[in-house]
């Protein structure tokens, strides 16, 4: 596999999302100026502890409008269409428990409020690239997965981390589609989980993460296609066996385990060379590893025989 050297994101002004759809220009110009405070008043009012913005990860594109992000959603437990946001409001967000188990020294249950209180929360503006060739930029609030793993202490034999989504038949009508291999399960290697970009998300736009976006807690690895990001997580399991994830079980030729973004490797039914920005409809070139190669390319240098791209 040919590994390239990557530069930080950059786009000409003409390709930036119109100001009406994003945060104001002062906020946009503040990106890159250091660690910036998210609005503590807004966060506290919304039930989310205040979090500082980490500007190490510069997205190179303007933030997508909150309205677009919260009303255009893939969440098959609520339906196989994009307009599930209203139906998802029926999913209870409190109480919520995440079980961390498997090959760890300290398996335990975490209440969501416990995680909000004890984990090192920060805001990160990340890109998200869907395998369906659309994309968005979101200010997520959360914590590095590595912080959680440090508490449970993985055994040396652990090789993979598996994420399982809640199954709540009373509020998730999509679960009646019995041909799908519920529950929704995804996974990554322990090395990928320990990477600094791997992020457990509990908020967006300075507010608690809404249910249609995977609230109260989801996972995000911005260099991978979006289907790798488990939503509404109830179990995190460490294992020595590579998991077969939800979409891989359904169609392994189209959706692989690694699912790293690569514009040069098409999906069997469409090109991945470009992506449509949510909200504006603008088409822009897709970047290898979604533009995060400088942080993750070295994870794959010895895996040339693996199908690293979905």
Where are these regions (language model features)?
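Intrinsic disorder/low-complexity segments enriched in polar/small residues
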Residues: 14, 45-46
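N-terminal secretory signal peptides
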Residues: 1-23, 34-38
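Structured, non-membrane catalytic/scaffold regions adjacent to prosthetic-group chemistry
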Residues: 46-310
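N-terminal export signals
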Residues: 21, 25-45, 219
């Amino acid at each position: 596999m040919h590994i390239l050297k990557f530069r930080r994101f950059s786009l000409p002004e003409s390709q930036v999302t119109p100001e009406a759809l994003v945060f104001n220009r002062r906020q946009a110009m503040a990106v890159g100026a250091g660690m910036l405070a998210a609005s503590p008043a807004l966060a506290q009012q919304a039930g989310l502890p205040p979090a500082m913005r980490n500007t190490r990860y510069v997205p190179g594109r303007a933030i997508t409008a909150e309205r677009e992000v919260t009303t255009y959603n893939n969440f098959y437990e609520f339906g196989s269409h994009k307009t599930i946001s209203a139906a998802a409001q029926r999913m209870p967000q409190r109480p919520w428990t995440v079980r961390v188990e498997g090959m760890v020294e300290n398996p335990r249950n975490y209440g969501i409020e416990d995680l909000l209180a004890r984990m090192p929360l920060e805001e990160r503006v990340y890109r998200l690239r869907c395998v369906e060739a659309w994309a968005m930029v979101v200010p997520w609030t959360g914590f590095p997965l590595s912080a959680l793993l440090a508490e449970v202490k993985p055994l040396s034999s652990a090789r993979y981390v598996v994420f399982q989504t809640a199954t709540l038949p009373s509020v998730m009508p999509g679960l009646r589609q019995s041909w799908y291999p519920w529950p929704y399960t995804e996974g990554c290697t322990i090395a990928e989980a320990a990477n600094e970009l791997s992020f457990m998300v509990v908020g967006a736009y300075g507010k608690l993460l809404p249910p249609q976006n995977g609230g109260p807690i989801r996972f995000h690895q911005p260099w991978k296609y979006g289907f790798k990001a488990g939503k509404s997580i109830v179990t995190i399991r460490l294992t020595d066996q590579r998991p077969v994830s939800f979409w891989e079980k359904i169609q392994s030729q189209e959706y692989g385990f690694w699912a790293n973004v690569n514009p040069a490797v098409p999906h069997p039914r469409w090109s991945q060379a470009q992506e449509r920005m949510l909200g504006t409809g603008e088409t822009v070139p897709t970047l290898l590893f979604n533009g995060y190669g400088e942080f993750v390319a070295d994870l794959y240098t010895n895996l040339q025989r693996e199908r690293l791209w979905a």
